[in-house]
């Protein structure tokens, strides 16, 4: 039997058992005696016996994911697409507040490694990276945040970010004069996630920083090893310090 169907069947059996025992349940699972469980009083009244005692706290609540699976709730991939549609909707009917809420939801979804890997399949890399250029500071901030989350400890997404031109954009955002500190710090976070243990991204980031007047080399003149966390930290610290001076 399907796992979800099995869980729903168990819940149904527990609920039916409770009903047969003459119990009703509050929404929090606490049992409540029937109204006629106590002795009746008054002329002509007939006494009734107490309702049977039932141990336990009633049927366990059904897992929402089980119900969603059984009854056609949206998948997480569909939720990701829907969130991006809200974020990029040009209609004035979609408020800025709703866009930022959608961004929060999107970021939480791509914390899951499998969901982050779906960005390519769902064609979401391009719109996400393009939001680094958005006129709204908070939109740029959330775009950098989501990119940092998507590529953290994930070479597959690190490769896609680099291939889609995201690394130069993040370096530009992290070092851009006039950009707010919070946006620069979030772009730095995204770069930190993008370059660690992925040499191609480290090399591109170093080249972009060099173009902007900062040489990223170790003492012997060689490139920074992306697997050397101490050296990577030194590079990232340069960007963090520049962000503080914004």
Curated annotation (Swiss-Prot):
SMART domains: ARM. PROSITE patterns: ARM_REPEAT. It comes from the Eukaryota. GO terms for cellular component: cytosol; endoplasmic reticulum. Signal peptide: none annotated. GO terms for biological process: cytoplasm protein quality control by the ubiquitin-proteasome system; regulation of translation. Its main location: cytoplasm. It is found in: Cytoplasm. GO terms for molecular function: adenyl-nucleotide exchange factor activity. Residues 23-40 have a biased composition (Polar residues). Residues 23-63 are annotated as: Disordered. SUPFAM superfamilies: ARM repeat. ARM repeats lie at residues 48-92, 113-152, 155-196, 214-244. Keywords: Cytoplasm, Repeat, Translation regulation. Belongs to the FES1 family. Functions as a nucleotide exchange factor (NEF) for Hsp70 chaperones which accelerates the release of ADP. Required for fully efficient Hsp70-mediated folding of proteins. This is Hsp70 nucleotide exchange factor fes-1. The gene is fes-1.
């Amino acid at each position: 039997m399907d796992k979800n169907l099995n869980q729903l069947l168990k819940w149904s059996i527990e609920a039916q058992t409770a009903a047969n025992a003459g119990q009703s349940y509050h929404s929090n699972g606490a049992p409540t005696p029937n109204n006629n469980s106590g002795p009746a009083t008054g002329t002509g009244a007939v006494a009734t016996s107490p309702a049977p005692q039932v141990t336990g706290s009633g049927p366990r609540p059904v897992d929402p994911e089980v119900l969603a699976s059984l009854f056609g709730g949206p998948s997480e991939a569909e939720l990701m697409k829907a969130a991006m549609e809200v974020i990029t909707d040009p209609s004035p009917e979609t408020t800025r507040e709703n866009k930022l809420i959608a961004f929060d939801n999107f970021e939480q979804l791509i914390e899951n490694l499998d969901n982050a890997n779906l960005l390519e399949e769902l064609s979401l890399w391009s719109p996400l990276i393009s939001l680094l250029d958005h006129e709204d500071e908070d939109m740029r901030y959330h775009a950098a945040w989501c990119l940092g989350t998507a590529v953290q400890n994930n070479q597959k997404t690190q490769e896609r970010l680099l291939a889609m031109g995201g690394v130069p954009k993040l370096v530009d955002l992290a070092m851009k004069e006039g950009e707010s500190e919070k946006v620069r710090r979030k772009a730095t976070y995204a770069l930190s996630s993008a370059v660690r243990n992925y040499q191609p991204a480290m090399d591109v980031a170093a080249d972009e920083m060099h173009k902007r007047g900062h040489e990223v080399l170790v003492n012997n003149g060689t490139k920074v090893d992306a697997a050397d966390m101490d050296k990577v930290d030194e590079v990232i610290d340069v960007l963090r310090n520049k962000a503080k001076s914004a």
